[in-house]
């Protein structure tokens, strides 16, 4: 039976260690400045992240003006707008301590309706919009993960070290070609188990089979220049996503992707006009799950062991029977 390597109190102390180390290194190595983040945005702005395009945001109206607001799913689009508003230049970027509510999330060991992540965004020049630049950025972030594991090992040697020396890059099409008989999720399990750490490139568009590896909203990532960082989780014995990131859409790719998804109405939103008219800067960015990080590096079996959220009674009981104590 599962046995946590730390008490609840020890876990809380270690969570701070994980978050503080990673935040400091992320800011330093990607040259990012921390900014204040909104909990909600106006509906008409189009700044909310609509994830896979089907999840419902929490909506409410403001007494003073009656304006409709949405609690954020993530700050994928807001960050790009903020870079423009704050006058950042190519090579400069920002990050936020993002908190969100995703009401339609299917709850399991790795998913909660409460989301906390380091949301970051950086301005790039047109010639930087390449797979090579994407991979270079992934390698920088992976280097932070490696150093974090080493740092924790010095303080908590019983946590062990599992990350390989290098992260492997693979496209979603190469995965389909390698494992045509498997579902996309099972392909992720197979490749993560084989290599320990992988970055899957190109998520959102249809593969040669006609199926997508996974859904992505049409209006933030360029589907050819994005991807997910996956590790093999030693406790769960499955693939484990730490980050979704990518080079963002330019006017050409946004035009193409909105047409593919049948979302031409979004062209009227302020954010989308800003991209289509080349007003907003070209960027790269992503979200790095804070609870996911803590869950992986502290070797936890459930995300509820590293964050406070709401769980159904039957799920709490099931966890208790497996010796999993949720916050």
Swiss-Prot record:
Gene Ontology, cellular component aspect: cytosol
Keywords recorded for this protein, A-Z: Amino-acid biosynthesis, Asparagine biosynthesis, ATP-binding, Cytoplasm, Ligase, Nucleotide-binding
GO molecular function: aspartate-ammonia ligase activity; ATP binding; catalytic activity, acting on a protein; transferase activity
Top-level division of the source organism's lineage: Bacteria
Gene3D superfamilies: Bira Bifunctional Protein, Domain 2 (3.30.930.10)
Subcellular location(s) of the protein: Cytoplasm
Location (main, coarse): cytoplasm
Keyword Amino-acid biosynthesis: yes
Entries under InterPro entries matching the protein: aa-tRNA-synth_II, aa-tRNA-synth_II/BPL/LPL, AsnA
Catalyzed reaction equations: L-aspartate + NH4(+) + ATP = L-asparagine + AMP + diphosphate + H(+)
GO biological process: L-asparagine biosynthetic process
Pathway assigned in UniProt: Amino-acid biosynthesis; L-asparagine biosynthesis; L-asparagine from L-aspartate (ammonia route): step 1/1
EC number: 6.3.1.1
Family: Belongs to the class-II aminoacyl-tRNA synthetase family. AsnA subfamily.
Family annotation (NCBIfam families): asnA
Protein name: Aspartate--ammonia ligase
Lineage of origin: Bacteria, Bacillati, Bacillota, Bacilli, Bacillales
GN (gene name): asnA
